[in-house]
Curated annotation (Swiss-Prot):
Domain Sm per the UniProt entry, residue ranges: 5-80
Self-association and partners: Interacts with SLBP; interaction with SLBP occurs when histone mRNA is being rapidly degraded during the S phase. LSm subunits form a heteromer with a donut shape.
Family annotation (SUPFAM superfamilies): Sm-like ribonucleoproteins (SSF50182)
Residues with the Phosphothreonine modification: 129
Gene source species: Homo sapiens
Residue numbers of Phosphoserine PTMs: 123
PANTHER family, A to Z: LSM1 (PTHR15588), U6 SNRNA-ASSOCIATED SM-LIKE PROTEIN LSM1 (PTHR15588:SF8)
GO molecular function: mRNA binding; RNA binding
Protein name as it appears in the record: U6 snRNA-associated Sm-like protein LSm1
Amino acid sequence: MNYMPGTASLIEDIDKKHLVLLRDGRTLIGFLRSIDQFANLVLHQTVERIHVGKKYGDIPRGIFVVRGENVVLLGEIDLEKESDTPLQQVSIEEILEEQRVEQQTKLEAEKLKVQALKDRGLSIPRADTLDEY
């Protein structure tokens, strides 16, 4: 096989359906329409998929331009196996509410963890304070 270096190898994947995982945790699914040398992507008929437990919801986003430095994972979706998922599709409102509840639960657990460490004389620096030099 003849492999092309870097992002040039993605030229073969243009016009195929892809899943893109972004640095901020979002998951996008759409058709790859364009790519450049910096791995900037243009996705068409894009949906943002939100997973909570065994449920998922799709939010239509249309044409989506993704800066290459924000891409964590890019993978082609097998159209034949796409419908064989064990996940249940729910409405946008329902998945957003479940996501909010899940995030609130995680926040409460983190607060309890920080308080338990504080009671023992330990502390974890907050993530936003680590950015300052």
